[in-house]
Amino acid sequence: TQENFEHVLRHREPVCIVFSLRYFQETGILTQENFESIRLHKEPMYIKEVLSLLQKTGMLTQQNFESVLCQDATDIERFLSSLHKVEILTQKNFEHVRSHPDLKNISRILKFIQEAGILTQENFEHVLSEQEITPLKLSLYYLQEAGMLTQENFEHVLSEQEITPIALSLRYFQEAGM
């Protein structure tokens, strides 16, 4: 309609809207409601990236799109991108994280270990089973900053009963330049 066309023309990110529409069209879920969802979303660029990743992997469905809208767009994009880069983005893995109560920290952990070259299905499952997500994220962050995030150090951190002291010791070493 003329109204939809004008919405795209006046949108602050029209290219993101057009690409999102294309992904919807290609997967058969282009509806007025979905258009309104992306048009009104506060992060259209991240939504476009999420839709692109889901479309590339054959996972762009109405249900997955709706679950993405319930998440922070930057966190879900970071999560999907990390898994996609190492070819472990599957519907099962998406569902595991989609329902995780701490998507923000999980997505950051995945980004750290993906950038370190140690994101595997096994390591992904270890991260999901971890109870102390925030201390794990901090420990991995400090290891990454020090250039010490390796598979061996990742396993050492995971094997500790108390991760918080590990994170603190890494922070103190980093602050002291040691």
PLM feature segments, named:
Residues 1-178:
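Ankyrin repeat (ANK) tandem alpha-helical domains that serve as protein-protein interaction scaffolds
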